[in-house]
Amino acid sequence: DNTIFKVWSPTATEVKVNIYTKGSDNEDGSAKLGTYTLEKVMENDEWTSLWSVNLSGDWKNYYYTYSITTTDTTHMGSDTTKTYETQDVYSKAVGVNGNRSMIVDLNDTNPDGWDNDQHILLDKSTSSQVYELHIKDFSYDKDSGVSDANRGKYLAFTENGTTLKNEGELSTCIDYLKQLGITTVQLNPFYDFQSIDESKTD
């Protein structure tokens, strides 16, 4: 097992990767496992602006950030450097508030039947009936007909036959969207929301 870290950073003078057990320092068992220096990737004796390191072992489900040292661009002509710690801008998964990237094997996150899923193609884009919604707002109301366990969560989208106040008359959630003739749902937001502190659950 091994994990390869790569960063394209032509202005950097040094790049390191920091490995953590958790997505934030506030979680139980949080610890920094180590810091590893990335090397310049050369091609035909020329630097490609790419940095890389190959760490042996199983790093899956740990978290990481990059420490990137670069010339201080706030002062023109300055040769002083500054180091920034940042998550990976190409992260596939992140910890709390997106501050640390997660080392993840996407094959492990795919639900059963994922490879058999077939995208529904429309004859033309003008055939789409698009509906934008917020994941929590979609089903959070106690009268939505969605089970208490799934209200306001992704799993609410899997419930069929939901009706207002569970009275069996007015369809809600997915069934309501189907009645409207909606073909495409855009989820807003489903990633990191800067104004929301994800460490607070209420």
Enumerate the predicted regions with their spans.
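Conserved, mostly hydrophobic/aromatic
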Residues: 7, 66, 133, 177, ...
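Beta-sheet entry/capping signal
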Residues: 4-6, 128-130, 183-186
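An acidic- and aromatic-residue-enriched active-site/binding cleft used to recognize and process polar
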Residues: 20-22, 69-71, 190-192
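Aromatic-lined carbohydrate-binding/catalytic grooves of carbohydrate-active enzymes
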Residues: 140-159, 180-202
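Short amphipathic alpha-helices and their capping/turn segments at secondary-structure boundaries
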Residues: 116-123, 171-181
